């Protein structure tokens, strides 16, 4: 119990240190007038300098630890440098824009909308639809929203610092988890390696990145907890801490349940697979009764995870039990080329491919003799099993989104690769101590080479962060902004005419970034893939299509008043041909790729040519507002 409390205290300390490093660094970066990343190499150059400084600092921290003095200071230094590495890798390239990777486009649009909703109110609500509980896990967005509300920062503007800070916190906690299990110097190596890979492949989705970097130590700890009844000389943790790791595994799964559904499902799948493999081995060795222990531990994990996950999932499940649900599984209706095949990162001819291949070989050699290796091997196999199941489920007209587990697979293999590199160097050093110096030099050079290329890999996402128009109507590259620069005028007009706060107004628009910047409710979401199943996306789309066949304002008002959902009172549209106003909507066409087909709905201008509507042009937009009853 004392060890568990000490570990918890170290995790809290790691979160505090990471938050402090991120806050100070991001504030310092924001105070300088930088050139835009796409048009200048200065930010990339400074990122490289910062990365080299952090990697050198970690090397020095490892030396201090090995010297046997100031070990608490060495741990603190390790937390500072892994945190600083994360911040400089993401924060420096984004230094001249207020937007995060991928700007306010596509997926980031609905994520920003969710953050805006939970900034406006702490209540757990759907991002778009009035009166519905959330379907997508709100954990990351709720905390970010509370930070935004506390600091008085617009949600869209807090997205970048919160994304970077949250990933930094996860990386720091990862270091703490590893140093609980392995030597501190090795914990530094595996943490910085997995952090770098996570930043490359998972950082555009910050809440997924947090779980991805935490998965390897969490799964190793879980495997140790499940196996704690066995008396093996090489197990990572002792038997007395077995139930502490079970509790920790339950907390991690519960955390994943409130954070990201797909990685929750994968982690649960992996833990169940671990339990079944262990129970089978115990049954063969000691009889059927021996299987009770891992099953009992699995039950404990499930109970803890379910209790935590219920905080965010219970409102939706309770509502879904009696309300109609449409487009069930639409979120899984996506099958890109990566989802149609198995990924083998260890076969890439690159630095990353080499470390993944080394990790694969280490797993094969050490699985039978190392708890770490066996845990990682099962986790890797679970990714491939999940991918095969995902391909098979296409027969049922859905998928398991296996392509989104490719960063997870890579991080697991890199984790194994670091352990393989360490053990290979140690084995060779028995014959010549100079091998350790050579290995250190190779490792440092490889780390610098891989890290400094991260901004290049992220360049497309970084470019969009500079070319999208932010909530102030400005672009990070200081070029003429897009039509979003008129959003402030639309917002002012809506507030003036309706006389209602934003969270009491439902808007129908195809320019969904308006809902990302301002906490209005939407009548229809971006696509069915992001829509709450309780919202009946398909029926709403059919209703909008029917309005295009109406001819008078009275018919439209009658149609609005008889809707089974809160009707829109604000319409943000574009001018169409032949005296019409247009909305460009989306339809799910899975299994085709692209999985979304855009179509245009033309609403006759005559529907709004009535004293009960206030209609005006604002930039390229047509704003039609249904006047309150007393003003009509």
Swiss-Prot record:
MF GO annotations: glycosyltransferase activity
Enzyme's top EC category: transferase
EC number: 2.4.2.46
Record field: transmembrane: 10-30, 45-65, 76-96, 162-182, 184-204, 206-226, 242-259, 263-282, 298-318, 344-364, 375-395, 409-429, 434-454
GO biological process: capsule polysaccharide biosynthetic process; cell wall macromolecule biosynthetic process; cell wall organization
Pathway: Cell wall biogenesis; cell wall polysaccharide biosynthesis
Function comment: Involved in the biosynthesis of the arabinogalactan (AG) region of the mycolylarabinogalactan-peptidoglycan (mAGP) complex, an essential component of the mycobacterial cell wall.
Name this protein carries in UniProt: Galactan 5-O-arabinofuranosyltransferase
Higher taxonomy: Bacteria, Bacillati, Actinomycetota, Actinomycetes, Mycobacteriales
């Amino acid at each position: 119990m004392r060890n568990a409390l000490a570990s918890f205290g170290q995790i809290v300390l790691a979160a505090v240190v990471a938050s402090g490093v991120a806050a100070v660094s991001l504030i310092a970066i924001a105070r300088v007038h930088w050139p835009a990343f796409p048009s200048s190499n200065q930010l990339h150059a400074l990122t490289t300098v910062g990365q080299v400084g952090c990697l050198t600092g970690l090397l020095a921290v490892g030396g201090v630890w090995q010297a046997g003095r100031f070990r608490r200071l060495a741990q603190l230094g390790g937390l500072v440098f892994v945190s600083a590495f994360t911040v400089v890798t993401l924060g420096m390239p984004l230094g001249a824009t207020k937007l995060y990777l991928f700007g306010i486009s596509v997926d980031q649009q609905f994520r920003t909308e969710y953050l805006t909703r939970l900034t406006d109110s702490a209540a757990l609500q759907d991002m778009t639809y009035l009166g519905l509980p959330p379907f997508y896990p709100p954990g990351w967005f709720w905390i970010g929203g509370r930070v935004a509300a506390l600091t008085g920062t617009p949600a869209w503007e807090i997205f970048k610092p919160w994304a970077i800070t949250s990933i930094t916190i996860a990386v720091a906690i990862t270091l703490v988890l590893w140093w609980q299990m392995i030597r501190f110097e090795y914990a530094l190596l595996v943490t910085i390696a997995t952090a770098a890979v996570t930043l490359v492949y998972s950082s555009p989705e910050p809440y997924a990145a947090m779980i991805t970097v935490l998965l390897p130590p969490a799964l190793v700890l879980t495997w140790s907890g499940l196996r704690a009844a066995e008396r093996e000389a090489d197990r990572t943790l002792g038997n007395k801490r077995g139930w502490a790791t079970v509790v920790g595994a339950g907390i991690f799964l519960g955390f994943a349940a409130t954070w990201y559904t797909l990685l929750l499902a994968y982690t649960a799948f992996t833990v169940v697979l671990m339990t079944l493999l262990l129970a089978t081995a115990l049954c063969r060795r000691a009889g059927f009764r021996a299987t009770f222990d891992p099953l009992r531990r699995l039950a404990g994990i499930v109970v803890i995870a379910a209790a935590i996950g219920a905080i965010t999932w219970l409102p939706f499940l309770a509502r879904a039990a009696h309300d109609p649900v449409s487009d069930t599984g639409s979120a899984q209706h996506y099958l890109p080329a990566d989802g149609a095949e198995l990924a083998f990162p260890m076969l890439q001819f690159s630095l990353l491919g080499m470390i993944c291949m080394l990790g694969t070989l280490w797993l094969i050699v050490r699985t039978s003799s190392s708890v770490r290796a066996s845990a990682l091997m099962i986790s890797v196999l679970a990714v491939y099993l999940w991918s095969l199941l995902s391909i098979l489920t296409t027969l049922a007209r859905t998928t398991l989104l296996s392509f989104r587990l490719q960063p997870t697979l890579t991080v697991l293999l890199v984790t194994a690769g670091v352990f393989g590199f360490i053990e290979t160097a140690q084995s060779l050093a028995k014959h010549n101590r100079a091998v350790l110096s050579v290995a250190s030099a190779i490792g440092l050079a490889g780390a610098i080479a891989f890290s400094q290329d991260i901004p290049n890999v992220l360049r497309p996402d970084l470019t969009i962060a500079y070319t999208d128009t932010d909530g102030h109507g400005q672009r990070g590259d200081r070029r003429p902004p897009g039509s979003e620069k008129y959003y402030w005028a639309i917002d002012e007009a809506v507030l003036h005419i309706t006389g209602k706060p934003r969270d009491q107004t439902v808007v129908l628009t195809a320019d969904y970034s308006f809902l990302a910047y301002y906490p209005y409710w939407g009548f229809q979401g971006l696509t069915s893939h992001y829509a709450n199943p309780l919202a009946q996306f398909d029926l709403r789309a059919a209703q909008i299509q029917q309005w295009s066949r109406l001819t008078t304002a009275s018919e439209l008002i009658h149609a609005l008043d008889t809707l089974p959902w809160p009707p829109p009172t604000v319409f943000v549209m574009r001018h169409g041909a032949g005296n019409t106003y247009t909305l460009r909507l989306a339809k799910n066409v899975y299994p085709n790729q692209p999985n979304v087909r855009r179509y245009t709905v033309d609403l006759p201008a005559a529907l709004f040519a009535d004293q009960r509507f206030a209609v005006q042009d604002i930039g390229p937009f047509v704003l039609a507002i249904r006047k309150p009853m007393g003003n009509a």
